[in-house]
Design a protein with these regions (language model features):
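Alpha-helical metal-binding/catalytic segments enriched in His/Glu/Asp
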Residues: 272, 284, 288-341, 473
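N-terminal capping segment at the start of a domain
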Residues: 23-65, 205-207, 293-294, 360, ...
Length: 483
């Protein structure tokens, strides 16, 4: 997940009592009921097991890396085990951003080791510092307004630290995306960003940033607060040199080294596409999707191995049914979601003559915990009412049947399709740890504890939740495709 989530989105909950309507024809309902039953089979841990095998073998799937290619080959080999599926790849040009050696050291002269090594992660797309690095004082700010108030006089020649506490990804993400660009305007030589999370165990969180001429990196919440306290004590001591320990309160000063390199259009790598062809209208398409690329830390189990493999798992469940859906159900594992959306843009361009044949596009890219439902973007009120009834009537036993209306594309990869006017949905789950309704602004706090960190490993995910997600997504796809 990269994009800003649902800021200012419109949340409408529709409760339609529809016990009296039999909306699905019996033949469709039978298939949907079987998919729901598959979701209850406690012995089936295949979605988790397969994702574990692939990620154990190849590690992360950073776009343009060799691991991305090997993982994609693993899927293309795996898909041969299933009958009734047609799989192919569609290449797109991708840039390769390599972080290489990087570090932040904080000068604390009272410690035995005066250069304290801080865990950090350079932000994707950042320029490097060169091997010599840069050394400068750090000026903490909690907002862009504060940056502007301090202005060139205070900022020029220094490194800006954005230390805002976690509110939501949308609110805090602006400092990661635009922090360096804005700081540069006031003559800053670098930017540090407090990692975007409400809960930290000294884990830095990376993520992409908008182009800027100065380097930028994420540090942990703990170190962001340490630097802020040092700065505040230093300012106090400057105003009043008589306070106790004033001479010990040095200005926070760091050495930032980033050998990051960006290789434009380094290689061509695929979106992975897998179809179960429809029996009556094979040219009409319902998409289930997640992105296949990940960051270069952890293994991208949660972001977005879970979304990609629950989509794929859904298709495998559908392949076990006694008959095919009327329309084609297409799984897409998108490339390059985490930085430049070349996968989404490439698909849109390559399929521009058949966009009108796309009936629905779903993506799962905000965690796969207990199924909750879909965030629907559609101007069609009939469709909203219909899906609300579908979800409530056919999915309550495994969850995933709630429907909420949003007025912005719910996920990055389906964004072009949603914007084109294809009804689309983000598949969302009850948040890990907080179990909050996902349509509240901070409803994804548990997800963001792991997002873009070394800790995004298989242990974040639960095999039974993944199976239920796959079954719920399969049921949605089948209901829509069989209409
Ligand atoms: C701030 O400093 C930058 C870099 O030194 C300079 O380009 C810019 O014009 C300055 N802006 C203001 C408002 O002084
Ligand atoms: C890289 O690829 C993109 C998209 O495929 C293209 O628009 C761009 O012109 C290419 N850039 C270079 C430097 O080749
Ligand atoms: C709205 O959705 C309904 C139900 O799927 C469909 O029958 C109808 O054609 C749609 N209307 C438009 C304008 O797309
Ligand atoms: C809707 O979400 C709630 C949890 O917020 C869950 O208990 C319920 O089963 C869901 N409903 C459906 C129809 O999936
Ligand atoms: Zn993602």
């Amino acid at each position: 997940m990269r994009g800003i989530l649902l800021t200012g989105a419109l949340f409408l909950q529709y409760y339609v009592s529809a016990a009296y309507i039999e909306l699905l024809k019996e033949d469709t309902l039978n298939m949907v009921e079987q998919l729901v039953e598959f979701g209850k089979d406690e012995k089936d841990t295949s979605v988790w097991d397969e994702l574990a095998e692939m990620t154990d073998l190849y590690g992360n799937r950073m776009t343009a890396s060799v691991q991305y290619s090997r993982s994609a080959e693993w899927v293309m080999k795996n898909v041969k085990k299933y009958t009734g599926m047609t799989a192919w790849t569609e290449d797109v040009n991708v840039d390769y951003w390599k972080r290489n050696e990087e570090s932040v050291h904080l000068y604390v002269p009272t410690r035995e080791n005066q250069m304290v090594n801080l865990p950090m992660l350079g932000l994707g797309q950042s320029v490097g510092t060169g091997p010599e690095g840069i050394e400068a004082n750090v000026i903490p700010v909690s907002s862009f307004d504060e940056l502007q108030t301090l202005g060139n006089k205070t900022i020029a020649g220094n490194i800006v630290l954005y230390n805002a506490d976690f509110v939501s990804y949308g609110e805090n993400g602006q400092y990661r995306f635009n922090g360096a660009f804005n700081a540069e305007k006031y003559g800053a030589v670098g930017a540090l960003v407090q990692s975007i999370t409400g809960y930290s165990l000294m884990t830095p969180h990376t993520g992409t940033m908008n182009p800027a001429g100065i380097p930028a990196a994420a540090i942990t919440v703990e170190d962001s607060k340490l630097i802020t306290r040092m700065y505040n004590r230093h300012m106090k001591a400057k105003q009043n040199p008589d306070i106790e320990n004033a001479e010990l309160f040095v200005a926070p000063r760091v050495k930032l080294v980033m050998n990051a390199q960006n290789y434009v259009n380094h290689t061509q790598q695929p979106n992975i596409i897998i179809d179960i062809k429809g029996s009556e209208k094979p040219d009409e398409i319902v998409i289930l999707s997640g992105h296949f690329d990940s960051w270069d830390v952890g293994v991208g189990a949660m972001d977005d191995g879970g979304g990609a493999f629950c989509s794929y798992g859904a298709l495998k469940l559908i392949s076990r049914l006694p008959r095919k859906p009327k329309r084609t159900i297409r799984v897409i594992m998108w490339n390059n979601e985490e930085s430049l959306s070349r996968g989404a843009d490439g698909y849109f361009a390559a399929h521009k003559n058949e966009l009108d044949k796309h009936i629905f596009a779903m993506e799962s890219d905000i965690g796969n915990f207990e199924p909750w439902g879909i965030e629907l973007m559609s101007k069609n009120a009939t469709l909203l009412n219909l899906y609300t009834v579908f979800g409530n009537q056919y999915l309550p036993t495994i969850g995933g049947g709630n429907v909420t209306l949003v007025d912005e594309p719910p996920n990055v990869d389906i964004d072009p399709l949603c914007a084109y006017g294809i009804p689309c949905g983000g598949f969302v789950t009850l948040d890990k740890y907080t179990f909050k309704n996902p349509s509240t602004p901070a409803g994804f706090e548990g997800y963001f504890r792991f997002h873009h960190t070394e800790a995004d490993r298989m242990e974040v995910l639960d095999p039974h939740q993944l199976r239920r997600n796959a079954a719920a997504m399969a049921a949605w796809a089948f209901m829509i495709a069989d209409q």
